[in-house]
UniProtKB/Swiss-Prot annotation:
Organism: Influenza A virus (strain A/Equine/Uruguay/1/1963 H3N8)
Record topology, Cytoplasmic segments: 551-565
Name of the protein this chain belongs to: Hemagglutinin
Keyword Disulfide bond in annotation: yes
Family per similarity comment: Belongs to the influenza viruses hemagglutinin family.
Length: 565
């Protein structure tokens, strides 16, 4: 009976003094948003850390088509830019063409007299950057020769023809006099003259066309002079021809004079191309051109420029993200993610931010969970949430502003004789890409570290703000929660949340409850001790009763005990 009584009293004591379920106390926990499956990002201190949300910074795919807006994109179709400039018959449609970006197709071909350009890449780049094929004919006087030479290799319609921007000069009768022609530049812009020299396949062809056994072409300005002698000899047959034409070009500055001297083999200019300075360019691509809007174009197609980096192609035109080697770089746009644990303990799923985050928060990144005499509830804290969001919102735009190129990255081309220059250029470009790739990774890691630190700081600010409000009216439970030692209904909780809580109103009640509870408070860890003590006392009392019964029986003679030594 005594044992039973003691156990009942101890059990009643434990449950009656539990402050968590009391009507005169409340529990308030502070926490932050969490998701079941976060995103891994890299920071300065951690190679992988989970956050609630992140934004991809690397554009790794294109639209597959080239947008024709806001840039003027000219589709070269089956013509190269140089063929269009020379006036190849099948490229007549491009005469006087204008563009911001000229698209050369892999299917482009020449369909006139076979030619070569010793400095092809430079001429191609020069014309491409000019953005126009605007041509002005000039009245060159070629006395004593036959003009407008034609070839069966260059058909315009059903008739033999030639490059429309060049004039093939041959003998007149049985003579080819020495030609001396000058053409001043009296305008205020640069003029580009295209000319050439014919290399016959045989000596017989040479004398048949130009009389002399070997011709010569000299083109001069005040700044330069080029003298070219034909190389007579057979070459591989192209469109029925084993001869060749070499194309050269000369820029005449304002106030300068173009001088042409030749005694044979001259492919003369018919006029000049007006040179313009600008940011026009050329790109090799087989992507289709479509009606759409994009400020960044690559050979793979247009790409959005709303990300700071791209991994689509090194060659770009327009306002484009920086090319980097990484296929993915994630910028943290949320806080550190600590998924919510399973429901446990007498306080259910409610636990503070030190233990875990809270899933399912829809009204903020930070908030409160509480349990009082009216039940349980949850509410977000908009002020701390907005403070964190404001600092993160402009982060992506700042990164884009630091990295977007406001110019185009054109293709670099070199002739075979410039192999060492090409190798050096490739090394420089690869080094720049390596450097930018490293800088990009470092920049993102720094920004991610800052984001996580500032979101952690906002959580700590909210906790300290709450602590300062409650003062001695509550106790920090060590897990992000406060045990409030006075009756705190929903209106009281709301005053804590919005910062209007007056601790003086509840101070006396809190102190009184704290002293009463502290006298008998049993935390969950001491309940086991009470049970063990109860068990030990019960065993002791049973032993005492049993020993007393034995001694009483011995005195009455009902039990005899013999002790032998």
């Amino acid at each position: 009976m005594k044992t039973t009584t003691i156990l009942i009293l101890l059990t009643h004591w434990v449950h009656s003094q539990n402050p968590i379920g009391g009507k005169n106390t409340a529990t308030l926990c502070l926490g932050h948003h969490a998701v079941a499956n976060g995103t891994l990002v890299k920071t300065i201190t951690d190679d992988q850390i989970e956050v609630t949300n992140a934004t991809e910074l690397v554009q790794s795919t294109s639209t597959g088509k080239i947008c024709n807006n806001p840039y003027r994109v000219l589709d070269g179709r089956n013509c190269t830019l140089i063929d269009a400039m020379l006036g190849d018959p099948h490229c007549d449609v491009f005469q006087y063409g204008n563009w911001d970006l000229f698209i050369e197709r892999s299917s482009a071909f020449s369909n006139c007299y076979p030619y070569d350009i010793p400095d092809y890449a430079s001429l191609r780049s020069l014309v491409a950057s000019s953005g126009t094929l605007e041509f002005m004919a000039e009245g060159f006087t070629w006395t004593g020769v036959t003009q407008n030479g034609r070839s069966s290799a260059c058909r315009r319609g059903s008739a033999d023809s030639f490059f429309s921007r060049l004039n093939w000069l041959t003998k007149s009768g049985n003579s080819y006099p020495t030609l001396n022609v000058t053409m001043p530049n009296n305008d205020n812009f640069d003029k580009l003259y295209i000319w050439g020299i014919h290399h016959p396949s045989t000596n017989n062809e040479q004398t048949k066309l130009y009389v002399q056994a070997s011709g010569r072409v000299t083109v001069s300005t005040k700044r330069s002079q080029q003298t070219i002698i034909p190389n007579i000899g057979s070459r591989p047959w192209v469109r029925g021809q084993s001869g060749r034409i070499s194309i050269y070009w000369t820029i005449v500055k304002p106030g300068d004079v173009l001088m042409i001297n030749s005694n044979g083999n001259l492919i003369a200019p018919r006029g000049y191309f007006k040179m313009r300075t600008g940011k026009s360019s050329i790109m090799r691509s087989d992507a289709p051109i479509d009606t759409c809007v994009s400020e960044c174009i690559t050979p793979n197609g247009s790409i959005p420029n709303n990300k700071p980096f791209q991994n689509v192609n090194k060659v770009t035109y327009g306002k484009c993200p920086k090319y980097v080697k990484q296929s993915t770089l994630k910028l943290a746009t949320g806080m550190r993610n600590v998924p919510e644990r399973q429901i446990r303990g007498i306080f259910g799923a409610i636990a503070g931010f030190i233990e875990n985050g809270w899933e399912g928060m829809i009204d903020g990144w930070y908030g409160f969970r509480y349990q009082n005499s009216e039940g349980t509830g949850q509410a977000g804290d908009l002020k701390s949430t907005q403070a964190a969001i404001d600092q993160i919102n402009g982060k992506l735009n700042r990164v884009i502003g630091k990295t977007n190129e406001k110019f185009h990255q054109i293709e670099k081309e070199f002739s075979e004789v410039e192999g060492r220059i090409q190798d050096l250029e490739k090394y420089v470009e690869d080094t720049k890409i390596d450097l930018w790739s490293y800088n990009a990774e470092l920049l993102v890691a720094l920004e991610n570290q800052h984001t996580i630190d500032l979101t952690d700081a906002e959580m700590n600010k909210l906790f300290e703000k709450t602590r300062r409000q409650l003062r001695e009216n509550a106790e920090d439970m060590g897990n992000g929660c406060f045990k409030i030692y006075h009756k705190c209904d929903n209106a009281c909780i709301e005053s804590i949340r919005n910062g209007t809580y007056d601790h003086d109103i509840y101070r006396d009640e809190a102190l009184n409850n704290r002293f009463q509870i502290r006298g008998v408070e049993l935390k969950s860890g001491y309940k086991d001790w009470i049970l063990w003590i109860s068990f030990a006392i019960s065993c002791f009392l049973i032993c005492v009763v049993l020993l007393g019964f034995i001694m009483w029986a011995c005195q009455k003679g009902n039990i005899r005990c013999n002790i032998c030594i």
